[in-house]
Amino acid sequence: RNLEKRLEVKVLDRTGLILEIFGSRAATSEGRLQVELANLTYQKSRLVRSWTHLERQRGGTGFVGGPGETQIEADRRMIETRIMRVKKKLESVVRTRSLHRKARQQAPWPVVALVGYTNAGKSTLFNRLTNSNVMAKDMLFATLDPTLRAIKLPGGQKIMLSDTVGFVSELPTMLVAAFRATLEEVLSADVIVHVRDSAHPDSEPQRKDVLDVLQELGVSEDAQFIELLNKTD
């Protein structure tokens, strides 16, 4: 807050910045709900620190029993109520996605999921393979909502190709939890194609970050993986 007052600009920490970007990219009601859930969880985690800071500014000697204590409880209850509402709405999203996954399992075509670090080129590859126009720009988190298309490979085999949310190092737990319904699309894939930006100086650390998130989601170690090195030119 002191920095914001001095610089007269909005100051964000890393998690807050990621949430801001996610919020600006969310194009569907599902995406917006997931961003809202993550944002509310983030706000709840910062309540105590915010009020302690205000008490110090006012010259208070302690937090317990101060005016902030009553207000923080009121704020917490309000946020928890909103979290419950959003979670309830997301439950229908989870059910719908689950039904769609079951329907795809009945189809004779294997499902291939594209995963990778944000801005690695997943959406560009997806567009080339499917002749689609999914937003593919040189920006972080251009894709928030998973997209699925049926394509025919050169050998004649048909597959369902899925484009997913890009990952980032130390992805906040609240984001993984909020976007679980979306990220779990990877769990039902027959093959996971890990698209890597081979020209990036942190290509190896990025690879580890992606694998860490997949492990957190519960992707089996026996899952069929293909590594695709992008931007080699």
Predicted features and spans:
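Flexible beta-alpha connector loops of hexameric P-loop NTPases
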Residues: 25-29, 71, 133-135, 165-176, ...
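Conserved C-terminal guanine-recognition region of P-loop GTPase G domains, centered on the G4
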Residues: 1-10, 154-158, 179-233
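Switch I (effector-binding) loop of TRAFAC-class P-loop GTPase G-domains
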Residues: 95-97, 103-110, 128-160, 168-181, ...
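Conserved lysine of the Walker
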Residues: 122
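Conserved P-loop NTPase architecture
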Residues: 1-111
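Walker A (P-loop) phosphate-binding loop of P-loop NTPases
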Residues: 119
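The Walker A (P-loop) glycine that initiates the GxxxxGKT/S ATP-binding motif of P-loop NTPases
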Residues: 116, 127
